[in-house]
């Protein structure tokens, strides 16, 4: 729970989407274009594979402009497609975890605003203040070190009522006479407005309950209580995530190796993308909530 890993797409809701709604820049049904933010001809993003194969890695961006094929469109969606250039509603893009949609929201919000929010307000302080202030890091989740499962779970608690409480393992320790021996004064504060938290909660419900969601149909059966969540896959499928919330709990599930390794080589691409982490979370929630009373 204390090892840092790249977040992949799990950072999208706590940064770009939450702030986009909080700032009034987007809403549930905002139409966004399903295409790369930067096209190859814009010469903004290097094609590192091409540059490496052709001995161009040492060239500056200015020098590289002489090589049109040294650039690529960015970003791609999971699986390598660049979208279909259609306009789709925000809720659909989030449910499907489309990078092409999230990056447009992130561009509206601004990478520095996202970083300041997740680093300072949500206390994801293992992020790098020098190297992680960019759209690739703040929207796509390709950070220098990443964050811990504990910190990521704590960040997602804001989607209940907008409040953030610092993670803690105990509240107090009493001696045998009932006197307080140790007290852990956790800090709580409002990170988002309740209205934004509610909209985000409903948006993230689609990940589990919509037929287009990346974890569609894999919500826990817990006495009719609803859930929300977000899948995540880091670069080269070395880190798999699911962060899910219920009216009682927020839980982060990370799946990977101590020495990072492509999980699709052992699990298969579809299993790695959509099933492993969310099914572990689903089984856990059904067990721990089995005897709990209904809570909205």
Per-segment meaning from a language model:
Residues 21-30, 125-129, 161-166, 291:
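Secondary-structure transition/capping motifs at alpha-helix termini
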Residues 109-127:
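Short, charged, amphipathic alpha-helices and their helix-cap/turn boundaries
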Residues 23-24, 37, 248, 258:
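Solvent-exposed coil/turn segments that connect beta secondary-structure elements
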Residues 25-114, 135, 176-206:
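Conserved catalytic neighborhood of penicillin-recognizing serine enzymes
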Residues 31, 92, 102-106, 117, ...:
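Structural recognition of the beta-strand scaffold that forms the well-ordered cores
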Residues 1-3, 7, 145-296:
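A penicillin-recognizing enzyme superfamily signal
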Residues 129-146:
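A glycine-rich, coil/turn loop motif that links secondary-structure elements
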Residues 1-14, 29-31, 137:
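Short active-site loop at a secondary-structure junction
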